[in-house]
Amino acid sequence: MSKLFWAMLSFITRLPVPRRWSQGLDFEHYSRGIITFPLIGLLLGAISGLVFMVLQAWCGVPLAALFSVLVLALMTGGFHLDGLADTCDGVFSARSRDRMLEIMRDSRLGTHGGLALIFVVLAKILVLSELALRGEPILASLAAACAVSRGTAALLMYRHRYAREEGLGNVFIGKIDGRQTCVTLGLAAIFAAVLLPGMHGVAAMVVTMVAIFILGQLLKRTLGGQTGDTLGAAIEFGELVFLLALL
């Protein structure tokens, strides 16, 4: 289990992980690591939240929110933001399904992808600022948002097909079973409930689950399945929806 966690941490983040900690784990078995996604999200969100708490007293709420979002992006290497941009470039191109998938593989940033990045990053900064001004616990909110967004991404893997013949997303999409999905969602729900007592955290997770499920169905209808890019888009979308649901 520990090898799976370290393997997933090095796979979906840029945090330094000694290679020996995940050595010997077959890449084809990475799908079992989906249950570690909420824990990894919890770690990323906690670090981002700590950055906010440290900087808030020094430079104020807006700049603290800006740097916490920046740190979160840096820790993932912009991995999920890149998926969001590619997904929006492809889906909003209004081309054929095959052409959309080709556009999503293009390394160049298009207009729709650029607009999506600007909107999501600015929205996160503004929502975090508003939550802080309302006295909400930012560290707990960010930790829960990152845990839930990565946990609910399982909804785009379970009983979905991979839209391409090959790619990194194929490790997870269509490869996880119902038990793994329930465990992943259950862990995310526990983190949300513990970090944000009462029904606040759980209610925000339910809203996020519904939003991610609908997004998954729309992407499935448009692209014929999911890709690594759509998983990244779902994680970014899930973070924003969860934070918005806390307002």
UniProtKB/Swiss-Prot annotation:
InterPro entries per UniProt: CobS (IPR003805)
Its GO biological process terms?
Answer: cobalamin biosynthetic process
Protein's name according to its UniProt entry? Adenosylcobinamide-GDP ribazoletransferase
The protein's annotated catalytic reaction(s) are: alpha-ribazole + adenosylcob(III)inamide-GDP = adenosylcob(III)alamin + GMP + H(+); alpha-ribazole 5'-phosphate + adenosylcob(III)inamide-GDP = adenosylcob(III)alamin 5'-phosphate + GMP + H(+)
MF term (GO), any: adenosylcobinamide-GDP ribazoletransferase activity
Q: Does the keyword Membrane apply?
A: yes
Gene name, per UniProt, is cobS
Predominant localisation class: membrane
Q: Where in the cell is it found?
A: Cell inner membrane
Q: Which family does it belong to?
A: Belongs to the CobS family.
